[in-house]
Amino acid sequence: MEQTYEYAWIIPFIPLPVPMLIGAGLILFPTATKSFRRMWAFQSVLLLSIVMIFSIYLSIQQINSSSVYQYVWSWIINNDFSLDFGYLIDPLTSIMSILITTVGIMVLIYSDNYMAHDQGYLRFFAYMSFFSTSMLGLVTSSNLIQIYIFWELVGLCSYLLIGFWFTRPVAANACQKAFVTNRVGDFGLLLGILGFYWITGSFEFRDLFEIFNNLIYNNEVNFLFVTLCAVLLFAGAVAKSAQFPLHVWLPDAMEGPTPISALIHAATMVAAGIFLVARLLPLFRVIPYIMYLISVIGIITVLLGATLALAQKDIKRGLAYSTMSQLGYMMLALGMGSYRSALFHLITHAYSKALLFLGSGSIIHSMETIVGYSPAKSQNMGLMGGLRKHVPITKITFLLGTLSLCGIPPLACFWSKDEILNDSWLYSPIFAIIAWATAGLTAFYMFRIYLLTFEGHLNVHFQNYDGKHKTPFYSISLWGKNGVKKNSCLLTMNNNESTYFLSKTKYPIDKNGRKMTRPFMTIAHFEHKAVSSYPYESDNTMLFPIFVLGLFTLFVGAIGIPFNQEGVNLDILSKWLAPSINLLHPKSNNSQDWNEFLKDAVVSVSIAYFGIFIASFLYKPIYSSLKNLEFINSFVKKGPKRILWDKILNGIYDWSYNRAYIDAFYTRFFVGGIRGLAEFTHFFDRRVIDGMTNGVGVISFIVGEGIKYIGGGRISSYLFLYLAYVSVFLLVYYLLFST
């Protein structure tokens, strides 16, 4: 076993040859490399599969022996400073490695077909493999310096992949927004790392935790400074995991290809923030204010993400806000000290959300046969509906993922979310009420997405091809009426557009974003020359990963069932995490009896079913297929209470549709303020600084020209003036000093 761990350092570097060879091939042999481009997809899947097998083998050994392995190479620079590099294999590392590789393999297989018609096929697989390398390097790092290096590489890869179709200005601005927002958190992370090195003198996790705990125990640290450094460390996780208030980049990250959305939201970028907090939890737990801050940020994000998902029309943006809310649950669990529950939900959510995103990609792919390549139309749930008849396999798997996120047993997220909800009652009743209420909202907005997409009729057939509504035959709206109430508020923004950080101009979607081999409609307007009247199911290479992730969604929750009775240990996850749990909670007991579990589960499942019922009432075709739901409303007497209720609903709708006005607030005050400051400094530089230097030159030029014209160019005149000046000088000298 020791020999196996010795070779674990190679894990991050196994996928690295793919981007290196693709880059070299495109430079040296571009034609041959492009001709055999699908070979690189096979190589990417093969190398990542090797990492997966190695990670599973290490995980089995850890479950059986509860071991942790760390190896460090020390580079001694001088007697006072040495730089250490190494790798750490513990339960957290093995869990993250399996998540990254399993989800990554499914995404790569899926992408082979999804990106088959794209000219950037090779570039896409190069980025994906480098993304896997960066994330694997991050989770195997044994110190904060390595964490930061791979942390920045993960951010770089996400920037490249979100802006993969960089010719579309919307995508270019989205990747810039993600990059700039994450720079805020990364700067805090760097300052926090330097602060804790100044306190402890070490970057290594094991030494850092031991030294810091001793300093806290002996009361030898400045608690204000320690708290500040911990907040700065946490800021990096807030930005990476899209927690409030640095969450604004996440929905705009949907401008990248859909497989990237699946990878970012399941196993890579957003998981990095949760991983960092979990890795540093032994540090944070001895600082009570930080643990409370983590839980507060988590519960705010839980509720905010759920409310923002309520009125989204873009299917990927709706799932993005769902990810934000679920990450809030994980952060809440970590803030409460529920280490096991947080990692359990990280595992179950990763597979469920990857399933949903790949399913949405299959839906978008099928919608493009009708509306052409236009994300504003192919991702618009208002143009979908009735797809259950056309994409039945996608429908079944998407329903599995939806039910899992809703918390319906026996699917994966039911087991993990229920643990977090139960732990929240012990931590804070207020937090518990918010968390349980948000569970109902989750069921509502997830079934809203499902019903708008798969039930009813294909809504695109009930629209004019100029994009305007016909007389509504099939009308669905969030609040049971046709149309959207427009808000004239100063901060209202168009939800179909990104918030532009670095550009004043807002551009339409570029028509040349992706080259397709089959014909498609123009993007500016619908045309009557449709390729196909109805969507069709995706190819097998796209359905296979969806099917596998569906199996994970069905069965992965079984690893964390917390029932240990009569010598039967069903809780594999607790045994797997035993070294970490014993470090954090030496006397913890994760077992639970059936009666207690069923009592808690009945409440959570009832709340989930209530949310599903409300969504079904508003969006099920039996209620929404009338010509206009206002027909029903006309029979209801609109008294003062009803008018007030409508105002409340419209306010919630505007809040959700306009992203809680947070993006608009940042754009107006932060971006506008920075741009105003830049314009002022530009004016000051041009008019004042340059004016002073240029003014001296102009004055010198004018004086010189004046003297030149006075002299006239004659030597006799120069001699006359010279003698006159000397005479005047001598006369003045005589008058002043003669006495």
UniProtKB/Swiss-Prot annotation:
Transmembrane segments: 9-29, 40-60, 89-109, 125-145, 147-167, 185-205, 219-239, 258-278, 286-306, 327-347, 354-374, 396-416, 425-445, 543-563, 602-622, 717-737
UniProt keywords, alphabetically: Chloroplast, Membrane, NAD, NADP, Plastid, Plastoquinone, Quinone, Thylakoid, Translocase, Transmembrane, Transmembrane helix, Transport
Predominant localisation class: plastid
Subcellular localization(s) per the UniProt record: Plastid, Chloroplast thylakoid membrane
Gene3D superfamilies for this protein: 1.20.5.2700
Domain of life: Eukaryota
GO BP term, example: ATP synthesis coupled electron transport
InterPro entries in the cross-refs: NADH_UbQ_OxRdtase_chlpt_su5_C (IPR002128), NADHpl_OxRdtase_5_subgr (IPR018393), ND/Mrp_TM (IPR001750), NU5C-like (IPR003945), Proton_antipo_N (IPR001516)
Mode of membrane association: Multi-pass membrane protein
EC number(s) reported in the record: 7.1.1.-
Catalytic activity: a plastoquinone + NADH + (n+1) H(+)(in) = a plastoquinol + NAD(+) + n H(+)(out); a plastoquinone + NADPH + (n+1) H(+)(in) = a plastoquinol + NADP(+) + n H(+)(out)
GO terms for MF: NADH dehydrogenase (ubiquinone) activity; quinone binding
Any one of the GO CC terms: chloroplast thylakoid membrane
Family note: Belongs to the complex I subunit 5 family.
Known role: NDH shuttles electrons from NAD(P)H:plastoquinone, via FMN and iron-sulfur (Fe-S) centers, to quinones in the photosynthetic chain and possibly in a chloroplast respiratory chain. The immediate electron acceptor for the enzyme in this species is believed to be plastoquinone. Couples the redox reaction to proton translocation, and thus conserves the redox energy in a proton gradient.
Subunit relationships: NDH is composed of at least 16 different subunits, 5 of which are encoded in the nucleus.
NCBIfam families reported in the protein's UniProt record: NDH_I_L (TIGR01974), PRK06590.1 (NF005141)
Protein name: NAD(P)H-quinone oxidoreductase subunit 5, chloroplastic
Lineage of producing organism: Eukaryota, Viridiplantae, Streptophyta, Embryophyta, Tracheophyta
Gene designation per UniProt: ndhF
